[in-house]
């Protein structure tokens, strides 16, 4: 027990040390990303639409700017999904979309062959309506999805920029991915897991951010799956000290977003969110309600978790939870 406490104190210290006085984390930048992705211009980012493709191009631009390496000569992983033709007046039941993916190579000669994945889906429900997942199916209006999940992508890009700024790669390699097709049934993550660009056994942990932009007054950040890798619950609680957050950590309770796809394939996961709200899957999920200061606290916490896990001293083995 004494050894374990020392281990987590050291890990937390090292991770916190990486966020320097010159940190790039900024609520203003977080809000800038969210404002663009949740703008009416992108019309709700429904998979297979122009707005969805424009969101992908925006994410790709920052993946390239912040130095991520490509898999297979490109940042896009294209795939097709089947949609009900009546959703958003889509003319065909088969539409093309893409995951956006790149990686940061690890610094340890051996451990860089292992991968930690951090991701957030970027699609939403377009104009809503019949056949969609909108809670107001009789209302035809743009569902901007500022929290679901422009906020997760804003955190993803904020974390990536911090890695680029620090220019210090952790021991293991890190895959950054933004999924499409999540709303239709985790389709982007399912495609990715069945078409991995690396060996499945090399993928050790997947961290997923879905709806992290509405931090409440109690500063509660909820997470499930922390018990799916060794000492994960202890780590995630320890990282909460001095973070300005109150992590609500579950060993199991894996949830229902893209990380579930990885868990079902025996890959350790953590799924993070700031809680539900009445605007979920409605046209009212807008940027005006985003807590950008809270979003940056969450981004810093997840950055520290990612650094800690990518530098984990002990083997990262999958632990099944009930």
Regions found by a protein language model. Give the residues of each.
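His/Asp/Glu-rich mid-to-C-terminal helical/loop segments that flank catalytic regions of hydrolases
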Residues: 165, 278-322
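N-terminal hydrophobic or amphipathic helices/low-complexity stretches enriched
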Residues: 17-70, 113, 319-322
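Metal-dependent peptidase/peptidase-like ectodomains
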Residues: 179-277, 317
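A non-catalytic alpha/beta surface segment that caps or lines the substrate-entry region
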Residues: 45-105
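Acidic/His- and Gly-rich active-site-bordering loop/insert found
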Residues: 37, 63, 84, 90-132
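Bacterial Sec-dependent N-terminal signal peptides
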Residues: 1-25
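Alpha-helical metal-binding/catalytic segments enriched in His/Glu/Asp
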Residues: 111-112, 118-119, 123-124, 128-184, ...
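Second-shell loop/turn segments in exported
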Residues: 23, 40-50, 86-91, 138-149, ...
């Amino acid at each position: 027990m004494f050894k374990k406490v020392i281990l987590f104190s050291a890990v937390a210290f090292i991770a916190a040390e990486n966020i320097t006085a010159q940190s790039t984390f900024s609520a203003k930048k977080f809000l800038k990303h969210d404002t663009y992705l949740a703008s009416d211009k992108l019309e709700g980012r429904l998979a297979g639409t122009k707005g969805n493709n424009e969101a992908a191009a925006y994410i790709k631009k920052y993946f390239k700017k912040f130095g991520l390496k490509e898999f297979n000569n490109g940042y896009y992983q294209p795939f097709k999904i089947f949609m009900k033709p009546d959703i958003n007046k889509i003319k065909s039941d088969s539409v093309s979309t893409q995951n956006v993916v790149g990686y940061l190579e690890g610094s340890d000669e051996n451990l860089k062959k292992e991968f930690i994945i951090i991701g957030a889906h970027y699609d939403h429900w377009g104009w809503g309506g019949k056949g969609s997942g909108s809670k107001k199916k009789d209302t035809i209006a743009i569902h901007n999805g500022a929290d679901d999940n422009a906020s997760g992508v804003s955190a993803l890009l904020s974390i990536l920029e911090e890695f680029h700024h620090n220019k210090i790669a952790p021991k293991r390699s890190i895959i950054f991915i933004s999924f499409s097709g999540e709303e239709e049934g985790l389709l982007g993550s399912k495609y990715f897991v069945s078409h991995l660009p690396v060996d499945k056994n090399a993928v050790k942990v997947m961290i997923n951010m879905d709806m992290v932009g509405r931090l409440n007054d109690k500063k509660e950040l909820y997470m499930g799956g922390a018990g799916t890798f060794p000492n994960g619950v202890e780590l995630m609680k320890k990282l909460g000290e001095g973070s300005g957050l109150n992590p609500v950590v579950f060993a199991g309770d894996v949830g229902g977003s893209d990380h579930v796809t990885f868990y079902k394939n025996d890959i350790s996961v953590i799924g993070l969110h700031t809680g539900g709200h009445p605007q979920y899957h409605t046209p009212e999920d807008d940027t005006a309600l985003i807590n950008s200061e809270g979003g940056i606290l969450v981004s810093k916490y997840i950055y520290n978790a990612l650094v800690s896990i990518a530098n984990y001293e002990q083997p990262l083995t999958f632990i099944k939870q009930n």
